[in-house]
Every structure is written in structure tokens, then in C-alpha cells.
Curated annotation (Swiss-Prot):
GO cellular component, one term: cytosol
Encoding gene, per UniProt annotation: kdsB
Official protein name in the record: 3-deoxy-manno-octulosonate cytidylyltransferase
Domain of life: Bacteria
Keywords annotated in UniProt: Cytoplasm, Lipopolysaccharide biosynthesis, Nucleotidyltransferase, Transferase
E.C. number: 2.7.7.38
């Protein structure tokens, strides 16, 4: 599958996961997880797929399956910082679109990867593009692990938060603080999907930006870009993506899926 839009996909992969050690190398149907992710990025039509890791074992495994890999430093505080190092090392042109495909999402939809890259290309005033999908249940809106995003009339992010935003005042206040009794939201609420496309020129700038107070409070790195005046275009998709792999239970679920596909 090819794409009319040239973009680079980078898959950050680090072995030092506290909940699931050696996660990028976990076996999924005979291949390491990080390779499965790289395959999805290739299906999305990326002009180039790179795996970025601070572990030689990961680089070796990726290269054995025909993908390019870049050795990066071990001290990066975020995946965006790791992408910035890759962009600097490889000398990407300023306008190169670089998509960060999380290394623990082997079921990510290639179409969504392609759509986010195209969305950034269609919004020249934005440095970043990402994705979101609508949520409708109060328990989702009030879950701090579900990051919400509020959009302006042009689909550009106004704010990301773990809090329930926008706050449906007349619907929520009569029931506050009993979250279990909360009705469904009265206006659209969007849950953020952690897939990003960047312009390479922004990636070169990102490591020089000071951490923002709102970023530290929410623990959301995209708020740093917004704090410093960058715009983030949001591609809304109607469907929630497949869940990533964070725990041993997640891994067992996805391994079972790959086993069933092999039959």
C-alpha cells in the first residue's frame, strides 16, 4: 500500500518498562512486538520506517526483519525528545512530516497513521497533528486516564486535560461529586489518541522549550508545545483505536489474537 503523501514513521522503543520489562521484544506470532508495529507503519504508506531505541538488542532484532534502526540516547524524558534526536541525526528537511507510532501498539490502524500525517499536511499553520474520537459515557469523561481534548471551530486543539472537559455545568452540578450518578455529556467530548505527526522543524525546536507549568500539572507533554504558542490540528475519527500493550494481561490478550490469526 502506498500513500500520495511522503512521510517518515518513527517507532520509539525502550526496554526499560517497569510494568512489562523487555516489552518491545515480546513475541507476537513469531516476531517481536516492535517489528509488528513497524509493519503497521509500513502498511500506512510511510516513505521510511525507522525504529529508535537506546538498546542494541532492539536495533538488532529490527534489522533482522529488514527495518532501519537508529541508536538514541537513554536519557530522553519523552518520546518526542527521542524523535527530535532522530530528526537531527538524519538531517530531515524542515517540512518533513514525522509520525510517532508508539512501539507498544501492534494493532494500530494503518489508515489512522496515514490520516494523521495527511491532516498535518492539510494544516500548514500547525506544527503538530494528532487524533481523537468521541466518547459518550460519564465514566469515560471522568476517568483521568482518558485524556480529553477541546477543539475550536477549525478542529485545532484548545486544551488537553485529564479533567472532564468541556464541563457540562447544568448536567453535572446537580450530581457532583457523585460521579456514578453523572448523566452523559450534553455536548461533544473527545478522547485523545496518542498518535502524533510533527514537522521536522518543530522537532528541532522542542528540546529547547522549557517545561510548561500546565504540562507538569497534567503530565501531558503536548501541552508544552501549546504553552509556547504552537498549534495542534486534531483528526477526529469515529472509532476508538485498539488498545496498546501496557501490562502482562494486555500482552496475553494480543498474543492470543495473533495465535488465532495464525490458525
Amino acid at each position: 500500500m502506498t500513500s500520495p503523501l511522503p512521510f517518515v514513521a518513527v517507532v520509539p522503543a525502550r526496554l526499560a518498562s517497569t510494568r512489562l520489562p523487555n516489552k518491545p521484544l515480546a513475541d507476537l506470532g513469531g516476531k517481536p512486538m516492535v517489528v509488528r508495529v513497524a509493519e503497521r507503519a509500513r502498511e500506512a504508506g510511510a516513505q521510511q520506517v525507522l525504529v529508535a531505541s537506546d538498546a542494541q538488542r532492539v536495533l538488532d532484532a529490527v534489522r533482522e526483519h529488514g527495518f532501519d534502526a537508529v541508536l538514541t540516547r537513554a536519557d530522553h524524558p519523552s518520546g518526542t525528545d527521542r524523535l527530535a534526536e532522530v530528526a537531527a541525526k538524519l538531517g530531515f528537511d524542515d517540512d518533513t512530516i514525522v509520525v510517532n507510532v508508539q512501539g507498544d501498539e501492534p494493532l494500530i490502524d494503518p489508515q489512522l497513521v496515514r490520516d494523521v500525517a495527511s491532516h498535518l499536511a492539510a494544516h500548514p499553520s500547525c506544527a503538530i497533528a494528532t487524533a481523537a474520537h468521541p466518547i459518550h459515557e460519564a465514566h469515560e469523561v471522568f476517568n483521568p486516564n482518558y485524556v480529553k481534548v477541546v477543539l475550536d471551530a477549525h478542529g485545532v486543539a484548545l486544551y488537553f486535560s485529564r479533567a472532564p472537559i468541556p464541563w457540562s455545568r447544568d448536567a453535572y452540578l446537580p450530581h457532583w461529586p457523585n460521579v456514578a450518578a453523572m448523566p452523559a455529556p450534553t455536548c461533544p467530548v473527545y478522547r485523545h489518541i496518542g498518535l502524533y505527526a510533527y514537522r521536522a522543524r518543530f522537532l528541532r525546536t522542542y528540546p529547547t522549550l522549557a517545561q510548561a507549568p500546565i504540562e507538569a500539572a497534567e503530565q501531558l507533554e503536548q501541552l508544552r508545545a501549546m504553552w509556547h504558542g504552537e498549534r495542534i490540528a486534531v483528526r477526529v475519527t469515529e472509532h476508538a483505536p485498539e488498545a496498546g500493550i501496557d501490562t502482562p494481561a494486555d500482552l496475553e490478550r494480543v498474543q492470543a489474537l495473533f495465535r488465532s490469526r495464525a490458525k
